[in-house]
Swiss-Prot record:
Region: Disordered, residue numbers: 1-23
Disulfide bond positions: none
InterPro entries according to UniProt: AAA+_ATPase, ABC_carbohydrate_import_ATPase, ABC_transporter-like_ATP-bd, ABC_transporter-like_CS, P-loop_NTPase
Superkingdom in the source lineage: Bacteria
Ranges where the ABC transporter domain occurs: 32-267, 267-518
Name of the protein in question: Arabinose import ATP-binding protein AraG 2
SUPFAM superfamilies the record matches: P-loop containing nucleoside triphosphate hydrolases
Keyword Cell division found: no
Binding residues for ATP: 64-71
Membrane topology: Peripheral membrane protein
A GO term from the CC aspect: plasma membrane
Upper classification of the organism: Bacteria, Pseudomonadati, Pseudomonadota, Betaproteobacteria, Burkholderiales
Assembly behavior: The complex is composed of two ATP-binding proteins (AraG), two transmembrane proteins (AraH) and a solute-binding protein (AraF).
Length: 522
């Protein structure tokens, strides 16, 4: 890779590429062209005669539900899957990749959601993996370090190239993956849900790099579930459904959100949220002057039986911290919680669950599931205490029956209860977490960002579960950063900012402007 190319990517002072306005760019012709690509597996047509072009100098978004065909398309581009029909062309030249190495050598790189780095190797070794500089058959450590350091500096990353990758943050590891692609001078770079584990600062840095890559004339494919990212970053967007390309929108500037959702799921946005009004009952949970970590002022609120109460706010507003105080995962410094009019004090989450209150945490993969365990084991983690009075022996038969009952009831897409939960989609993992608490006869469900990273179709199923819970007289507290979601699903919305409650908005008055005005700092 040339120094000029790496300089343009850095986004540092003097770089004119990082902040190029979309209107000032002039994307070239198709750098990548797919025509009639078909991929079949036993009993499944994963891609059905898909045609797609990606231009030089554009960010092309790919959207669709899980199973729509996006991942299979990336595997075709990377040489993992070979199509049974159709053609792939780079710069007008037909290509057929028998391996990932062949795709890389042709100039196509994929940055997967699960990063493909070797944790025990150094940053420099990962950057140059497969093309380590050598002298007389021995790795030239000095040249290796110099090239790696140059690449990191020009990417704007100040990382010691000699440290093992396992010590880096997710955002830093992602930059190493991008660096690997640039070291091979990839002209087509595909990103698969790249912000799913990034902080706001890391996301901003990633977007700056992607804009710089676009300004250099590279073709960027951007797979995401997050509509706000499509509107912020992409030039065009293509929607997949059931293995087919449904539509390509040549401009996202005036693209109607409802139309985009309709293309993805085959139904209207009203059907996605499917709001079902209810009559609320008596107060089920009440916080009175609750104070503690993450809160700047004492917090008081009520939630009734049959209600879905939304909590909206910006990052750092204190919503997740409040949920942990309610759940017994953090100790309040003042105030208390009442359930059914009775004062309760939880010394631990276990106490909260016994009292009928449960939390589905924001970080589902780290705090909500045991990824290496089976669906059945994850579902039964809490219910096991009911199976054996002595709590010494597990009732395997009852566990299997319980797991199968909730797999069927919640339409969890899995082969069986023995399937590792890590193999399931995000939406189905969330259903397992919900099923765990349904088995515990929970009355108050604290749902912290429950649909983050979940496709639109799976969201509709989860919303339907919320409505069923509320109609059964339970209470759902929905913490969400998605304006459309919190407005579409909630009966009323409490807005937090800077560790305190800023106001409450009724369903009839809930608009994006009303919520944002309350949520913004002074």
């Amino acid at each position: 890779m040339t120094t000029q190319t790496m300089t343009a990517v850095s986004g540092n002072d003097g770089d004119t590429g990082a902040d190029v306005d979309a209107g000032a760019r002039k994307p070239g012709g198709p750098l990548l062209a797919l025509d009639g690509i078909t991929v079949t597996f036993p009993g499944v047509r994963a891609l059905d005669a898909v045609s797609l072009s990606v231009r030089a100098g554009e960010v092309h978004g790919l959207m669709g539900e899980n199973g729509a065909g996006k991942s299979t398309l990336l595997k075709v581009l990377s040489g993992v899957n070979q199509p049974q029909a159709g053609t792939l062309a780079l710069n007008g030249t037909a290509q057929r990749f028998a391996s990932t190495r062949a795709a890389l050598e042709a100039g196509i790189a994929i940055i997967y959601q699960e990063l493909h780095l070797v944790p025990e190797l150094t940053v420099a070794e990962n950057l140059m993996l497969g093309q380590l500089p050598s002298r007389l058959g021995v790795v030239d450590e000095r040249t290796l370090a110099a090239r790696a350091l140059d690449a990191l500096e020009r990417l704007g990353e100040h990382i010691d190239p000699g440290i093992p990758v396992k010590y880096l943050s997710i955002g830093q590891r992602q930059m190493i993956e991008i660096g690997k692609a640039l070291m091979r001078d990839a002209r087509v770079i595909a990103f698969d849900e790249p912000t799913s584990s990034l902080s706001a600062r890391e996301t901003t840095q990633l977007f700056r790099i992607i804009r710089a890559l676009r300004a250099e004339g590279r073709a960027i494919i951007y797979v995401t579930h997050r509509m706000e990212e499509v509107y912020e970053l992409c030039d065009r967007v293509t929607v997949f459904r059931d293995g087919r390309r449904i539509d390509t929108f040549d401009s996202v500037t005036d693209l109607d959100r409802d139309r985009l959702i309709g293309c993805m799921v085959g139904r209207s946005i009203e059907d996605v949220y499917g709001y079902r009004p209810r009559t609320a009952g008596d107060v089920l949970i009440e916080a009175k002057g609750l104070a503690g970590p993450g809160l700047s002022e004492p917090v008081s609120f009520t939630a009734r039986r049959g209600e879905i109460v939304g909590f909206f706010g910006l990052v750092g507003a204190g919503r997740s911290e409040l949920m942990k105080l309610l759940y017994g995962a953090a100790r309040p410094s003042a105030g208390h919680v009442e359930l059914n009019g009775k004062r309760v004090a939880f010394g631990s989450p276990r106490d909260a669950v016994r009292a009928g209150l449960a939390l589905c945490p924001e970080d589902r993969k780290q705090e909500g599931i045991v990824a290496i365990a089976s669906v059945a084991d994850n579902l039964n983690i809490s219910a096991r205490r009911h199976f054996s009075p002595a709590r010494m022996l597990l009732d395997a038969r009852r566990e299997r029956e319980l797991a199968q009952r909730y797999i069927e009831r919640l339409a969890i897409k899995t082969r069986d209860g023995d399937t590792p939960i890590g193999a399931l989609s995000g939406g189905n993992q969330q259903k397992v977490v919900l099923a765990r608490w349904l088995a515990e006869r929970i009355d108050v469900f604290l749902m912290d960002e429950p649909t983050r990273g979940i496709d639109v179709g799976a969201r509709a199923e989860i919303y339907n579960l919320f409505y069923e819970l509320a109609e059964a007289g339970r209470t759902v507290i929905l913490v969400s950063s998605d304006l459309a979601e919190v407005i579409g699903v909630s009966d009323r919305i409490i807005v937090m900012k800077e560790g305190r409650i800023a106001g409450e908005v009724a369903k009839a008055q809930a608009t994006p402007d009303a919520l944002i005005k309350l949520a913004l700092p002074r």
